[in-house]
């Protein structure tokens, strides 16, 4: 198996995000934000409850929104109103929340994931630390 590289890590993350959202990995690299229809996908991360009502993901270039068709227009208007980096901030998120709340939903979970930069990782000398088994 080839060694991991920053590019391989990014490609793996893009592929999994695309599976989860129902788009193509290259959609995250486009210059424009897009909306795709959310759908059930057996290869998605198991803890996700699909289809999404609304899920926004950005790798920095744009926002890919995976939504139920009932929210497509309002989510599209939202992600095209602000630059990608501002779609995930308050007070802008309040605008999305207000629109979703009129349809019985609210903004709920926010998560940030960071990909490692392999050039910044340094070996840790774990053998220098004492190992003890703790008990009652």
Predicted regions and their residues:
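Contiguous mid-protein beta-loop-alpha structural module that forms a pocket-lining wall or clamp
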Residues: 2-4
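Acyl-donor-binding surface of acyltransferase catalytic domains
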Residues: 12-135
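Early transmembrane hairpin of solute transport permeases
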Residues: 6-8
